[in-house]
Amino acid sequence: MRCPFCGNIDTQVKDSRPAEDHVSIRRRRFCPACGGRFTTYERVQLRDLVVIKSTGKREDFDRDKLERSIRISMQKRPIDPERIDQMISGIVRRLESMGETDIGSKQIGEIVMEALARIDTVAYVRFASVYKNFQAADDFDKFVSELRPDVPGDE
């Protein structure tokens, strides 16, 4: 593994253990050239997934990109980080087990929204605002009103 600090290709594993999500291995590494320490994660990848964008462009599925967008939607929310990791791993497993190597970005977005809706409605609305490209406050109002059950006298 190449050292992210100095580029040395000869690093050493100092500690290896299951990560909190129990679907990956966490490794602490040390670079003898610069003394840098860093962490890597090893995960099983069932198949190489390709994302088909709405423009028709194809790109390799990037778990880190998925994780970043989910974590942004959950920023400052009272959600256990381990629960977020489990949700992300569940989404990736679901995508990999679909039997398809090509998956539309719209399909991925719907799966993420479904998972977020079960965990936190604020994160769900945040993600939806980007995914559905809200342009005005009315877009938020319409989306949130569809979430709420009809409340008597709330007209």
Swiss-Prot record:
Cofactors named for this entry: Zn(2+)
Listed GO biological process terms: negative regulation of DNA-templated transcription
A GO MF label: DNA binding
Sorted UniProt keywords: ATP-binding, DNA-binding, Metal-binding, Nucleotide-binding, Repressor, Transcription, Transcription regulation, Zinc, Zinc-finger
ATP-cone domain mapped to chain residues: 49-139
Cofactor note: Binds 1 zinc ion.
Top-level division of the source organism's lineage: Bacteria
Entry-linked PROSITE patterns: ATP_CONE
Zn finger spans (unnamed): 3-34
Family, similarity comment: Belongs to the NrdR family.
Cross-referenced NCBIfam families: transcriptional regulator NrdR
Task performed by this protein: Negatively regulates transcription of bacterial ribonucleotide reductase nrd genes and operons by binding to NrdR-boxes.
Protein name: Transcriptional repressor NrdR
Organism of provenance: Roseobacter denitrificans (strain ATCC 33942 / OCh 114) (Erythrobacter sp. (strain OCh 114))
